[in-house]
Amino acid sequence: MRTLWILAVLLLGVEGNLVQFELLIMKVAKRSGLLSYSAYGCYCGWGGHGRPQDATDRCCFVHDCCYGKVTDCNPKTASYTYSEENGEIVCGGDDPCKKQVCECDRVAAICFRDNIPSYDNKYIQFPAKNCQEKPEPC
């Protein structure tokens, strides 16, 4: 319980997009991104290096690559708009950069949902020393 309280307090200090990303993951994948993907494999969480360990970790790798292509705004703080139409997330708004960030998050949330069967607890808190292989290009 104390851990959940700490996570809630930390989440309140996070701005814009990372909160939206968490909400999008919860809506699409029906699980908490913060609890499930903040420290998973070599790419889920802050930074990322080495090779993705499984399909779930690859979702984070692709998400990192997608954020890396965003140039006109900060993907970690840019707030975007989206709606749900016929059960699908649709990114909206007039700002192309924010829409691009939304698309990165939307695709990642769908990837997490589609790869729930690959999720393996052995990759939670995965040691960075196991992520030393040469990374593949985005």
UniProtKB/Swiss-Prot annotation:
> What tissues express this gene product?
Expressed by the venom gland.
Q: Which cofactor does it need?
A: Ca(2+)
Q: Which Gene3D superfamilies match?
A: Phospholipase A2 domain
* Alphabetic keyword roster: Calcium, Disulfide bond, Hemostasis impairing toxin, Hydrolase, Lipid degradation, Lipid metabolism, Metal-binding, Platelet aggregation inhibiting toxin, Secreted, Signal, Toxin
Where is this protein found? Secreted
Keyword Transferase on this protein?
no
Catalytic activity, as annotated: a 1,2-diacyl-sn-glycero-3-phosphocholine + H2O = a 1-acyl-sn-glycero-3-phosphocholine + a fatty acid + H(+)
On whether Acetylation is a keyword of this UniProt record, the answer is no
Q: Which Gene Ontology CC terms are recorded? A: extracellular region
> Mind telling me which residue stretches traverse the membrane in this protein?
none
Q: Which InterPro entries match?
A: PLipase_A2, PLipase_A2_Asp_AS, PLipase_A2_dom, PLipase_A2_dom_sf, PLipase_A2_His_AS
Q: What is its main location?
A: secreted
Designated name of the protein:
Acidic phospholipase A2 Cvv-E6e
Q: What's the source species for this entry? A: Crotalus viridis viridis
